[in-house]
Design a protein with these regions (language model features):
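Propeptide (latency) domains of metzincin metalloproteases
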Residues: 89, 99-102, 109, 113, ...
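His/Glu-rich zincin catalytic helix
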Residues: 95-99, 103-108, 268, 288
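Active-site-proximal, well-structured secondary-structure segments within enzyme catalytic domains
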Residues: 6-8, 38, 45, 49-92, ...
Length: 297
């Protein structure tokens, strides 16, 4: 049964790759794939540029930092110093900089500015604007799907998944949608009640969500996320991850400072089987920096 499934999967992959198409259609498919590959690369480069380079929230007055922890303020001061703005504080669209600000900063206007900066990445009608890139990707994806015999791109994507059809996906999402919406409405009501209690004369907006969700959580459960941070120091997280991998899969991670890395912040580990056989090299790269895609790798 497993071998039959493997053969079916391989055949389907060839079919989805255009193996059954006549030669001229295969050439057309290759061209579409090349264009989509270049556009996808361009999309990512634009988002990366907008995230890392083209937006900075510069704070001049210390009172505008109210609500932020000392380590977040210190990191913003260091970012400002590196940008040649010593004595100020700079927040970027990188998650470790942006999320604490949205979650804890009391200055609502600055939260709005930072949130909208993130929301509008690659949407400023400049060299990094993605509107036309997205339109081109949508058009080419539709062409590729139809070339391969599918009615649309959605049908092409889910054909080899468990859902099989876009209609099944819609039905599944609709089952989730109603209870999720009710839960979100309840959370919104709790946050609006907190705003009203504090004398706020405004309706909850998107840039308020993290801030008031944290306040409601703290009021309801006496839980302050900032107090959890000492338990999740990077060294502890790495040790925990390695421990779990060893328990689940029996593999070992051995730190290898002798192996060259592409950046001084990256760390190299050799991964071995339980008996010491070499599996491969694993790089860990946790910190944001200019030119790097967001997130820990």
């Amino acid at each position: 049964h497993d071998q039959l499934r493997l053969v079916e999967k391989i055949y389907q992959d060839f079919e989805r790759g255009g193996a059954n198409l006549p030669a001229e259609k295969q050439a057309e498919l290759r061209k579409l794939n090349q264009q989509l590959s270049m556009l996808s690369l361009k999309f990512g480069e634009n988002v990366l540029a907008e995230t890392n380079k083209n937006f900075k929230l510069v704070v001049d007055k210390k009172e505008d930092l109210k609500g932020l922890s000392d380590d977040v303020i210190a990191a913003a001061a260091e970012t400002a110093k590196k940008a040649g703005m010593e004595g100020k504080w700079v927040f970027t669209l990188q998650k470790p900089s942006m999320l604490p600000f949205l979650q804890y900063a009391e200055n609502r206007d600055l939260r709005e500015k930072l949130y909208k900066g993130y929301l509008n990445r690659a949407n400023y009608n400049n060299a990094f604007d993605n509107k036309q890139v997205i339109a081109d990707i949508v058009k080419l994806r539709d062409q590729r799907a139809k070339l391969l015999g599918y009615p649309n791109y959605a049908a092409y994507v889910v054909d080899d998944n468990m859902a099989k059809t876009p209609e099944n996906v819609d039905q599944f999402l609709m089952k989730l949608w109603a209870p999720a919406l009710e839960r979100a409405k309840k959370e919104r009501e709790d946050m609006q009640a907190m705003i009203d209690k504090e004398g706020g004369k405004f309706k909850l907006q998107s840039w308020d969500w993290w801030y008031y969700a944290e306040k409601v959580r703290k009021a309801k459960y006496d839980l302050d996320e900032a107090q959890l941070k000492p338990y999740f120091k990077l060294e502890n997280v790495i040790d925990g991850m390695i421990y779990v991998a060893n328990k689940l899969y029996g593999v070992k991670f051995i730190k290898r400072p002798d192996i060259p890395v592409y950046n001084e912040e990256a760390m190299a580990y050799e991964v071995q089987e339980a008996d010491g056989r070499h599996i491969g090299i694993f790089y860990m790269d946790f910190h944001p920096r200019p030119g790097k895609n967001a997130g820990a790798w």
